[in-house]
Amino acid sequence: MVDMKLAQQKGFSFGNATKFMDFADPRAMIKDAATLDPNATVPAYMRTYANPRVIEVLTAERAYRKIAPEVKNGDFTTAFTQFRSIEFTGNTTPYGDYDGNGVSGVNTAFPVREQYRFQTTVKVGDLEQKMNAEAKIDLFAEKQKSAAINIDIAFNKYALYGVAGKAVYGLLNDPSLNAAITPIVVNSTHTVWAEKTANQQMDDLNKLVASLYTQAAGHIDDSTKTKLLVSPATLAAMNKVNDYGVTMKKMVADTYPNLTVVVVPELYNATLETSTMILLADEILGQPTVEFGYADKYYAHEIVRDLSSWKQKVSAGTYGAIVQLPFAIGSMTGI
């Protein structure tokens, strides 16, 4: 059973609910008759029990959660969040008894991100609730789960693209990132991996790796844990084999053992029929390269009784992608 206090600390708010519904234990569920009969008030079980399935949805694996960790910043009332970015600087000189040369310092920055609040609603009619209950379906709980799914889809979108017109940026369009490099052209025109051999694909990846290592100025090498973000089309192209029967995937695993491939469907451009791939370090000197900030994962507002129905607003708040180390992210577009 999920702990209510821990859930609140992680950004899940269920209003006046004091416990989670145990769907595995019929004794914990309200009797059908009590959920079916229309009355002037909201059924007590809706206020007393929280639906644990929304937590399952909002913590399950989704593309952005495989890329970087999520971090809670503030709460529903927080308008802006400020995070700290530190770059280490300095140099050394030959030792001398009376020499004070050489200095070590830091460059600090405090970027600000705005909270974007978004919402959806759950509505249940008396008749539809009664009809679904005949089939042993808790319609209100299922619609809450649907709300959680829609919220999670939105979180994924904002983590990658941000929100237009606000200081909320995504991993794919953060203004602090370096411009994407281009793949190697083969046969005069081909850049897309579907038209390249496994070895030619590997050449493109090596080019991206070299570019990232160079801009990181020695902070990233083969021992650094990294992630390669690719589209489904790119992942499929990586199954090509070279003249020795070795796939691109196998070559990547052998050459870069600390690299993890993550599939991100949004990296495919259907209009151009090309993909982008992103290479990033998980962290540098203990500082994460990127985090996905949120204020509330699931904020359940009061359930409101109407003439013959109930409704509930569910909201959440995001700061998008908080890129702390732009130099630790590189990309290549047109593959």
What are these regions (language model features)?
Residues 120-204:
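Alpha-helical scaffold segments that mediate packing/assembly in large oligomeric complexes
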Residues 172-245:
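Extended, solvent-exposed, turn-rich assembly/linker loops in the middle of proteins
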Residues 165-166, 177-178, 233-237, 268, ...:
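Short, catalytically relevant binding-site loops at active-site mouths
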Residues 33, 37, 45, 49, ...:
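Alpha-helix boundary/N-cap detector
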Residues 40-120:
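Assembly/oligomerization interface modules of large self-assembling protein complexes
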